[in-house]
Amino acid sequence: MLLAIVLAARFRKPVPIVFGILFATLANHAVASFAGAEAAAWFDGYWFRLAVALGFIAMGLWTLVPDKFDEDDKPQESFGPFLTTLIAFFLVEIGDKTQVATIALGARYHDVLAVTTGTTLGMLAANVPAVFLGDKLVQKISLKHIRWTAAALFVGLGIWMLVTL
């Protein structure tokens, strides 16, 4: 979300930024979802389901750690808002919490299209308001509250998976 705010403030062109986020997320999450589904096909069984459940709980706890965006990580501006956003979001998502969660969801549900669609919609739901509202949004909604809610959802899903093993 912080990257979306920075890009919106820098370029002041929300539509290409939103499309950059959309296409970067689709590409990144399709690969992650596919990787999760394939891993589940290779390692299906009780221990794998247990690992996925514990992974969701770990994701919930990891969600409580705020994202960082260093000034040194500023994206290159020479490409324009769409390409800069596309590249920056794709690279920032590699190994990030949402990518790890997408891998876990792909492993759990074995449906690359549904998982990619759902996680991409989630990313857009989090980032599009940030692009259009930026600083005003952060002043109105506590990021701490959002993190705690997301953490509770991840932990709840992990516990539900443990109970249904």
Label the model's feature ranges.
Residues 1-4, 84-102:
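Functional transmembrane helices that embed catalytic/metal-coordinating motifs
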Residues 1-41, 100-122:
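Juxtamembrane transmembrane-helix termini in multi-pass membrane transport proteins
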Residues 47-55, 111-126:
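Structural signature of hydrophobic alpha-helical transmembrane segments
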Residues 64, 68-92, 113-117, 121:
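Small-residue-enriched transmembrane helix starts and helix-helix packing motifs
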Residues 13-72, 77, 129-140, 149-152:
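Membrane helix-loop-helix hairpins that form the core translocation module of multi-pass transporters
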Residues 26-27, 61, 90, 94, ...:
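Hydrophobic/aromatic residues within the transmembrane alpha-helices of Major Facilitator Superfamily
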Residues 158-165:
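Juxtamembrane boundary at the C-terminal end of a transmembrane helix
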